[in-house]
Regions:
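N-terminal module of bacterial RNA polymerase sigma factors
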Residues: 1-32, 150, 177-180
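C-terminal edge and immediately downstream basic/flexible tail or linker adjoining helix-turn-helix-like DNA-binding
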Residues: 2, 43, 148-151, 166-180
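Structural recognition of an alpha-helix C-terminal capping motif at a helix-to-coil junction
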Residues: 50-57, 70-82
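Helix-turn-helix DNA-binding module
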Residues: 123-131, 139-156, 167
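Internal acidic/polar
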Residues: 3-7, 86, 91-120, 142
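Arg/Lys-rich amphipathic alpha helix in sigma70-family domain 2
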Residues: 61, 65-68, 78-98
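Amphipathic, Lys/Arg- and hydrophobic-enriched alpha-helical face
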Residues: 26-45, 62, 122, 174
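Sigma70-family region 2
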Residues: 15, 41-43, 54-71, 90-91
Length: 180
């Protein structure tokens, strides 16, 4: 039934320009979108908030392009994915997201060692690997959903997941996180 709620809110927002309905969609999905950006930016809360805001603005302005062929969340994450990669493309080579200054940034001063190590492990991944790993492991998305969001083929997504998980496991194992 949650999907029916989305359809009702989308209809209200798109056809009747009902801002309250759009607000309900933002409330429902903002935590997921923000988590996606926090993982992609390795904990940069300010940048994540800016990118999330850009995502919802673009979604609002482009409601007419939502055809309902996929779920609203898939469409929204596709916008988020594009917003992030547009941001990455505009960065100067020296503005890498994998610098220690960015990796140490967080909205909380009480990050556990594990959270910091996970952030460092994510920093080792390519952007494509990080996107696939974040969507699957942190957002619980299926491979089919990831292929729709990223536009990658299923085999490519599986390959990025395999390599990304291996890199992260190797890093964490090297830093004392053994499976027991």
């Amino acid at each position: 039934m949650r999907n029916l709620e989305d359809i009702a809110w989308i209809t209200q927002a798109a056809i009747f320009h009902n801002r309250a309905a759009f607000g309900r969609l933002v409330e429902k999905y903002q935590a997921q979108v923000r988590r996606f950006f926090l993982s992609q930016t390795l904990g940069d809360t300010q940048l994540s908030d800016d990118l999330a805001q850009d995502t919802f603005v673009k979604a609002y302005l482009n409601f007419s392009r939502f055809r309902g062929e996929a779920s609203f969340s898939t469409w929204l994450f596709r916008i988020a994915y594009n917003v992030y990669y547009d941001h990455v493309k505009t960065q100067h080579p020296t503005d890498s997201l994998e610098t220690p200054a960015v990796m140490g940034r967080s909205g909380r001063d009480t990050d556990s060692g594990l959270q910091m190590d996970l952030r460092h492990a994510l920093a080792l991944l390519t952007d494509a690997e990080r996107t696939c790993v974040v969507l699957q492991l942190m957002e619980g998305q299926s491979i089919d959903h990831i292929t729709m969001v990223t536009g990658m083929r299923e085999g490519t997504v599986k390959s990025h997941l395999s390599r990304g998980k291996k890199k992260m496991a190797d890093y964490l194992r090297h830093n004392g996180y053994d499976r027991q």
